[in-house]
Amino acid sequence: MRHLLTEVNVPIPDKVTITAKQRVVEVKGPLGTIKRAFRYASVDIQKPTADNVKLQIWQASRKERAVLQSIASQIKNMIRGVTEGYKFKMKLAFAHFPIQEAVAKDGSSIEIKHFLGEKRIRRIQALPGVKISRKDEEKNTLTLQGIDLNNVSQTCALIHQSCLVKEKDIRQFLDGIYVSDKRLAMNE
């Protein structure tokens, strides 16, 4: 069944400005700017008032309405990112061979050494806007911080996938780097 008009309103908080032009949404806030294109969807993105963004789709099927809700959620995540930011923590888990990590001084990349006793060095470059850090008082913990939820979580996935156990029983070999905590950066 097709609905004639489906509409979703996204409220804009104070200190945040949003510009929408030709399905490209740019969100500016106190922590930075995020720009994302939604050209793949036939959605009308309008800003009728200063505190509201209106998303509309005409003659939409169920899947197209789901895309509309996904775009609304992404815009809400962008607003939350430029106001509060995102912070993910990753734990280094090992049984016998301790994993050694070296974070670049600017936090843009990480080197992982001695995973399962291998001599190979794994280098992972962080996506734009993501800062990797390690505190000495928190042993075997990495912290990834940024304003774009997609980039922060994708960088976590790249780090996790670089340390997967291959050709062994994963129930026995639990070594790796895993996400242990996801939160907003301001909530500490």
From Swiss-Prot:
In terms of InterPro entries, this protein maps to: Ribosomal_uL6-like (IPR000702), Ribosomal_uL6-like_a/b-dom_sf (IPR036789), Ribosomal_uL6_a/b-dom (IPR020040), Ribosomal_uL6_CS2 (IPR002359)
* Biological process per Gene Ontology, one example term: cytoplasmic translation
- Pfam families (alphabetical): Ribosomal_L6
* UniProt KW Ribonucleoprotein keyword: yes
Under the GO molecular function aspect, what terms does this record hold? rRNA binding; structural constituent of ribosome
Record carries keyword S-adenosyl-L-methionine: no
PROSITE patterns in alphabetical order: RIBOSOMAL_L6_2 (PS00700)
What superkingdom does the record give?
Answer: Eukaryota
Q: Which GO terms describe its cellular component?
A: cytosolic large ribosomal subunit
Alphabetically sorted, this entry's keywords are: Ribonucleoprotein, Ribosomal protein
Q: Which SUPFAM superfamilies match?
A: Ribosomal protein L6
Which family, according to the similarity comment? Belongs to the universal ribosomal protein uL6 family.
Listed name of the protein: Large ribosomal subunit protein uL6
Look up and give the organism this protein is from: Tetrahymena thermophila (strain SB210)
Name of the gene encoding the protein in the UniProt record: RPL9
